[in-house]
Amino acid sequence: MAFTLTNKNVVFVAGLGGIGLDTSKELVKRDLKNLVILDRIENPAAIAELKAINPKVTVTFYPYDVTVPIAETTKLLKTIFAQLKTIDVLINGAGILDDHQIERTIAVNYTGLVNTTTAILDFWDKRKGGPGGIICNIGSVTGFNAIYQVPVYSGTKAAVVNFTSSLAKLAPITGVTAYTVNPGITRTTLVHKFNSWLDVEPQVAEKLLAHPTQPSLACAENFVKAIELNQNGAIWKLDLGTLEAIQWSKHWDSGI
């Protein structure tokens, strides 16, 4: 079902980083009512730029680390709901690429995403009288086929795809729909230099960037198109400037 972003309230976790910032720029062009950015480090210049692109959109920043206990996330969301009354879309975009930091990679890329999603269900779940909502989780093409030199990062992205696919199937119960956007190799600071697991490939970043990549802006444009297409359960691949819905192969079914 097509979705218009005009006059909507969007909460964007990590909306100031590489792909995140370019996506935020595309979002404000869609005449949102509110764009609420939750990020670890404030960037006043970026916030000012977003406001200048479309002064009609209210852009608000809250400091947020996705690794905090879920109770703190719920408290922050309560503040945001009190101010906006409604939130239409949650974008979970926090991510790091450094397989030296095993625990933090899992905490940021997966656990934090799960916790933020779980927290907003307190407000959205129709079983609690909530209105439902839309969750857009940022995965990666490494969730389809791993970059084997960074198995921890790739594993977290595979987990995001599976978690989000489960959320989509739960939509009739919760009223909350969900899908993933999965960028291919995109020219951002994230991939300029990073560590492989156990240093199995010291030149992993250089070797990766020797292959075709896409600019962050092209990825961001397709990111927003995916939001507007609003297909519950979609697994979007955003690679080399294209947007494609992946048809996942089923090799097993629980039968329940």
Curated annotation (Swiss-Prot):
SUPFAM superfamilies: NAD(P)-binding Rossmann-fold domains. Keywords: NAD, Oxidoreductase. One of its GO terms (biological process) is alcohol metabolic process. GO terms for cellular component: cytosol. NAD(+) binds at residues 12-35. It is an enzyme of class 1 (oxidoreductase). It comes from the Eukaryota. It catalyses: a primary alcohol + NAD(+) = an aldehyde + NADH + H(+); a secondary alcohol + NAD(+) = a ketone + NADH + H(+). CDD domains: ADH_SDR_c_like (cd05323). Substrate binds at residue 140. Its EC number is 1.1.1.1. One of its GO terms (molecular function) is alcohol dehydrogenase (NAD+) activity. This is Alcohol dehydrogenase. It comes from Drosophila teissieri (Fruit fly). The gene is Adh.
